[in-house]
Amino acid sequence: MDLDDFRSVMDNAGVDVWTFIDTAILVASLDYGQELKRRRDNIVERLYATSMANKCRNCDFGGGGNVTEAAIGRVNNGRVHEETEEEDEEGVTAAAEEEVREKSVNVEDDDDFDPFAGLFDDEQKSIVEIKEKLEDPDLSEESLVELLQNLEDMDITFQALQETDIGRHVNRVRKHPSNNVRRLAKQLVKKWKETVDEWVKFNQPGDLEPPSLIADEDSPVQKALHNGSRQQVPDFGYSPVPQNGYSSSSKNSNITEPERKPRPVAPQPRRESPSPAKPSRPSPSQQTIPRDKEHKEVDFDTARKRLQQNYRQAENAKKQRTIQVMDIHDIPKPKKGGFFPRKGGSSQGGRHW
């Protein structure tokens, strides 16, 4: 487009050049996103190049910024003439290459309006590139370890995890034959799980339902979902249950509370009446056990007493039945005197033995 024609368009629209540029970038990002991604490097290079008025507006800067000719369109009697003009090639290319190499593009952040619509997020771009490389089945162990280490060095947010879907690809290499690969994969999954836990803590269950980032049935969060957790959350790593997992315990309590409220209405008094009676009242079999023990002890005592009495009686009987055998000479002699008592006080009438 000719410069004069462009100026006339802005005058007719009643907008300045900066509003026109912002609107053009926004429309390009919405309607021609892929084309804008392909052209954005050249656009940034042109922004930092010098002498823009002397450059061709339609030439391609894909060759690293080497510009040798510039065309200026002029209107003369309805015909467009192009004139070429040589520039200082070394100065232009050196400045452009230095700016591109150092990546010193400083764009002011605007929270209310994002004209680039997130297209210049270098972190997400790197994550997507790593994800594409992880899809290669012939990837060597060294390359895989390097990619996982690069992911570990990044501070990936929940939004980046959700948009790039890197969690699923890393979760697939948790069962890799290499110990280093398995260790790095588990560390990443654990780190990202903590990020998801923080996001869940600061967001109410009913506000948003983020899609699961890893569809692995071995993950604890996926098991928690099968066990009754209805809130859809990303699945990462091992969690004893936190999980069980993580804050799903609070969610499960919130979900099960309304189910427990109607239950105590009728069954509780029925269950309470027999429950305290069981430990207080021993069964008949339990009551007979101590009684049998007491009877046995009493029987033992009486039997012991009877035996002792029998032994005593036997000893006494033996003593009574003992016959003393004595020699005739050992028999004691009777005392002197009459057998019959004396009469009359005289000793002559009596007999002596």
Curated annotation (Swiss-Prot):
CDD domains: TFIIS_I (cd00183). GO terms for molecular function: translation elongation factor activity. It comes from the Eukaryota. The modification Phosphoserine is found at S219. Residues 125-199 form the TFIIS N-terminal domain. The modification Phosphothreonine is found at T84. SUPFAM superfamilies: Conserved domain common to transcription factors TFIIS, elongin A, CRSP70. Residues 290-304 have a biased composition (Basic and acidic residues). Residues 225-353 are annotated as: Disordered. Pfam families: Med26. Keywords: Coiled coil, Elongation factor, Nucleus, Phosphoprotein, Protein biosynthesis, Transcription, Transcription regulation. One of its GO terms (cellular component) is nucleus. Component of the Mediator complex. Belongs to the Mediator complex subunit 26 family. Component of the Mediator complex, a coactivator involved in the regulated transcription of nearly all RNA polymerase II-dependent genes. Mediator functions as a bridge to convey information from gene-specific regulatory proteins to the basal RNA polymerase II transcription machinery. The Mediator complex, having a compact conformation in its free form, is recruited to promoters by direct interactions with regulatory proteins and serves for the assembly of a functional preinitiation complex with RNA polymerase II and the general transcription factors. This is Probable mediator of RNA polymerase II transcription subunit 26c. It comes from Arabidopsis thaliana.
